[in-house]
């Protein structure tokens, strides 16, 4: 298993109280495959550097996970299929 940092930018029209419960359904993919969700950091609504899908703001969420590469690919695929997710970025962190 490798450590990853996943940044997700969500639609700003979502209620911020529903962000964590809706992310849990996606994070269950990691847990089901034997991975570990180490941290979920919800930054809240921030201004975007440029418009994405006609939105100037987005709700930023940073997730630290330890999982297999195939599991992270599946998580990224499922997030990108969700209409409320504007953008995702997956980075492998090399914490020794």
Swiss-Prot record:
GO cellular component: cytoplasm; peptidoglycan-based cell wall; plasma membrane; ribonucleoprotein complex; ribosome
One Pfam family per UniProt: Ribosomal_S6
Domain of life, source organism: Bacteria
GO MF annotation terms: small ribosomal subunit rRNA binding; structural constituent of ribosome
Disulfide bond sites: none
GO aspect biological process, one term: translation
Cross-referenced CDD domains: bS6
Keywords: Ribonucleoprotein, Ribosomal protein, RNA-binding, rRNA-binding
UniProt cross-references to InterPro entries, sorted A to Z: Ribosomal_bS6 (IPR000529), Ribosomal_bS6_CS (IPR020815), Ribosomal_bS6_sf (IPR035980), Ribosomal_S6_plastid/chlpt (IPR020814), Transl_elong_EF1B/ribsomal_bS6 (IPR014717)
UniProt key word Ribosomal protein: yes
PROSITE patterns documented for this protein: RIBOSOMAL_S6 (PS01048)
PANTHER family named among the record's database cross-references: MITOCHONDRIAL 28S RIBOSOMAL PROTEIN S6 (PTHR21011), SMALL RIBOSOMAL SUBUNIT PROTEIN BS6M (PTHR21011:SF1)
Function: Binds together with bS18 to 16S ribosomal RNA.
Assigned protein family: Belongs to the bacterial ribosomal protein bS6 family.
Name of the protein in question: Small ribosomal subunit protein bS6
Gene: rpsF
